[in-house]
């Protein structure tokens, strides 16, 4: 727990430094970061400011299509094609090319929206299914036999036991299995997102709805799937460690000499010798301290207690 908090604190420092370098830090944003102690929430806060590689949305911005994306998101324009025609220049070939670029920008905005990401997470939490299938051509390999139970496997993620999950992940790491995690119904995710972002049924609204579907399929779903994959493996690892620790505890608590009574002595001078007696099953029968050495030098009393 302490190590995780230290890692989170270091991550906060990096995030704050990056946002400040961009000149986008505000008092409200700084307060949110300072008061956030959940790594997933912290990354959601940072996502809109995270330096990006050359994405489709960034390419569209460089073509000057962000104003068109803003118009589409407002969903008030009644003659969208005429408005899109105003952006046909340079690398933008035609109206459809302009609309496509604007949709890419909207899709990125949907992906970076905290509420949208949390809605998809909630659906994954309730109904995520883990599916494993054998990679074509691998089923006859010698190493594949131990994963035969998972060649065509599907189960709710929240019911998948740790040993099964770890076995599936080993099969994936060895290239035997292809593993996916997804909701039972993708439509519930897209419906929720459309209710959040789409207003009305005009030209702009249909474009936003298309962008929302693209955002979910291309950006949001893969990101949340990766997130749940890591979280589920972490939980499975923790459960495996817990089971191992419990088994080790039982082993260490087992009678050290089998079915025999045992007496153990922890020697000491000033504080005395601590004596413990166990029965044949390792259950505590008696414990007390004796003082055969100086300063008390109760040799005879100590001997009687030992014999008794």
Regions found by a protein language model. Name each.
Residues 1:
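Catalytic phosphate-handling regions of large nucleic-acid enzymes and associated NTPases
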């Amino acid at each position: 727990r302490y190590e995780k908090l230290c890692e989170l604190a270091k991550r906060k420092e990096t995030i704050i430094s990056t946002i400040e370098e961009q000149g986008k830090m505000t008092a409200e944003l700084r307060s949110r970061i300072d008061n956030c102690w959940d790594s997933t929430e912290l990354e959601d806060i940072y996502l809109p400011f995270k330096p990006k590689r050359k994405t489709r949305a960034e390419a569209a911005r460089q073509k000057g299509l962000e104003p068109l994306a803003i118009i589409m998101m407002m969903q008030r324009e009644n003659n969208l094609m005429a408005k899109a025609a105003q952006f046909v220049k340079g690398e933008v070939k035609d109206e459809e090319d302009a609309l496509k670029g604007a949709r890419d920008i909207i899709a990125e905005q949907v992906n970076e929206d905290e509420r949208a990401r949390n809605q998809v997470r909630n659906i994954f939490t309730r109904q995520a299914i883990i599916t494993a299938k054998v990679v074509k051509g691998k089923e006859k390999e010698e190493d594949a036999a131990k994963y035969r139970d998972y060649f065509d496997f599907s189960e709710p993620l929240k019911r998948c036991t740790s040993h099964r999950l770890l076995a599936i992940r080993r099969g994936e790491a060895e290239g035997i299995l292809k593993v996916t995690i997804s909701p039972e119904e993708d439509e519930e995710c897209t419906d929720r997102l459309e209710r959040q972002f789409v207003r009305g049924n005009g030209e702009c609204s249909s474009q936003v709805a298309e962008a929302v579907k693209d955002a979910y399929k291309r950006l949001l779903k893969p990101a949340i799937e990766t997130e749940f994959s890591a979280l589920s493996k972490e939980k499975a690892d923790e459960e495996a460690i817990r089971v191992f620790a419990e088994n080790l505890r039982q082993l260490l608590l087992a009678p050290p000499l089998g079915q025999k009574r045992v007496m153990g002595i922890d020697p000491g001078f000033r504080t005395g010798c601590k004596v413990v007696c166990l029965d044949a099953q390792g259950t505590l029968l008696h414990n007390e301290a004796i003082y055969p050495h100086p300063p008390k030098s109760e040799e005879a009393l100590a001997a009687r207690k030992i014999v008794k």
